[in-house]
């Protein structure tokens, strides 16, 4: 059962759930909390790679990822990031989220943005128990027009679901947690699998 707005507020009040900066009451709706777009992005560089063999040797996968992914792009205040049709980009939420070991989170895009072709997460919308950090967004523009995305705009909504008990292996306690405490638009670390 997902938390309702009253329960979300109660979990925030007792700091069992932490969202920083804390959302104002008008951004807590029914069963969700609105999140905003941060100012960090990452895109694919122009490259000549025919493919990336994701099951190849880890050092080759790592080298291929380094060739195709850009350095992190940090937008100055007031500037827009343009996502063109058919492009994939990584971004990050403005808010940082800390989940307790007995709560899982879910990220959903906004219907108003989806109706323009913007996918906010390609497939990864679960936020594991014990997560701490900003949430990376996997943007894809499936529409016909470029979209101007500005830091601070409403970009998605989080919902939360209590578990039957605390997780035995919460995210931030795992040694193999590839994105522990992420604060930026971190590229794929599939080579760490």
Swiss-Prot record:
Alphabetical keyword list: Hydrolase, Nucleotide metabolism, Nucleotide-binding
InterPro entries: dCTP_deaminase, dUTPase-like_sf, dUTPase_trimeric
Disulphide-bridged cysteine pairs: none
Positions of dCTP binding: 110-115, 128, 136-138, 171, 178, 182
Residue ranges of the region described as Disordered: 169-193
EC number: 3.5.4.13
A Gene Ontology biological process term: nucleobase-containing small molecule interconversion
UniProt superkingdom: Bacteria
Pathway in which the depicted protein is active: Pyrimidine metabolism; dUMP biosynthesis; dUMP from dCTP (dUTP route): step 1/2
Annotated PANTHER family: DCTP DEAMINASE (PTHR42680:SF3)
Family from the record: Belongs to the dCTP deaminase family.
HAMAP family in alphabetical order: dCTP_deaminase
Protein name: dCTP deaminase
């Amino acid at each position: 059962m997902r938390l309702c707005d009253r329960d979300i507020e109660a979990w925030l009040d007792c700091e069992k759930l932490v969202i920083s900066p804390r959302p104002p009451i008008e951004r807590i709706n029914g069963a969700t909390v609105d999140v905003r777009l941060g100012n960090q992005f990452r895109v694919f560089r122009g490259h000549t790679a025919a493919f990336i063999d994701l099951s190849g040797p880890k050092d080759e996968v790592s080298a291929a990822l380094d060739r195709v992914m850009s350095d992190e792009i940090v937008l100055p205040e007031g500037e827009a990031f343009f996502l063109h049709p058919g492009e994939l980009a990584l971004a990050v939420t403005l808010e940082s989220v800390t989940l307790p070991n007995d709560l899982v989170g879910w990220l959903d895009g906004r219907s108003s943005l989806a109706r323009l072709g913007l996918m906010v997460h390609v497939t990864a919308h679960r936020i594991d128990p014990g997560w701490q950090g900003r949430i990376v967004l996997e943007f894809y523009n499936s529409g016909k027009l470029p979209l101007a995305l500005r830091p601070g705009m409403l970009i998605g909504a989080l919902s939360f679901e209590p578990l039957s008990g605390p997780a035995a292996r919460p995210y931030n306690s795992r040694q193999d947690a590839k994105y522990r405490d992420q604060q930026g638009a971190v590229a794929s670390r599939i080579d760490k699998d």
